[in-house]
């Protein structure tokens, strides 16, 4: 997701709108990409956990594992192949190069973003009107608990500098997540 290609933050679910606004904050995109590349994090799932944290909801490792189980088929069949294709087209084969290859890559990027949006909308529907998890004492406590639950589900710890950037951006946001 890049700020120049993102749709209007006024469309979609509250979770999608939160994601667009949050991702546009300074250093957030780089931190998300670092976590994706270094630790295999599903950025959409991480954003979902941070969105819940913004509403002071802490999810358990079992909650996160169930979310992962439900979203993995879509991610693996659509989002990851589109991302792989988009990245490969940064250095296209010589048969189709230059502006035509870049135009095609831009179209793939738009489809990738739409696949991510569809995943996020489905995740929002999974939560339903009642949010997942349990009430936490603070936004930061919920965020740390949700990230820890995700890391535990993945079998390890996430790179701390990237996590701290995301937590600082979330805690310092100063607005409700649905705004």
Feature annotation, model-predicted:
Residues 28-72:
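N-terminal interaction modules that seed assembly of large macromolecular complexes
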């Amino acid at each position: 997701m890049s700020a120049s290609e993102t749709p209007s933050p006024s469309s979609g679910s509250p979770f999608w709108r939160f994601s667009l606004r949050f991702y546009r904050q300074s250093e957030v995109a780089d931190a998300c990409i670092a976590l994706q590349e270094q630790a295999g994090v599903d950025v959409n799932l991480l954003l979902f956990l941070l969105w819940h944290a913004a509403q002071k909801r802490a999810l358990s490792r079992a909650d996160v594992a169930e979310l992962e189980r439900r979203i993995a088929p879509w991610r693996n069949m659509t989002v990851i192949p589109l991302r792989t294709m988009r990245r490969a087209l940064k250095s296209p084969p010589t048969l189709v190069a230059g502006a035509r290859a870049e135009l095609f890559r831009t179209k793939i990027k738009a489809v990738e973003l739409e696949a991510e949006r569809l995943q996020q909308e489905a995740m929002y529907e999974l939560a339903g009107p009642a949010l997942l998890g349990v009430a936490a004492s603070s936004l930061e406590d919920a965020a740390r608990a949700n990230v820890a639950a995700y890391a535990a589900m993945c079998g390890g710890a996430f790179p701390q500098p990237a996590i701290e950037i995301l937590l600082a951006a979330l805690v310092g946001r100063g607005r409700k997540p649905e705004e």
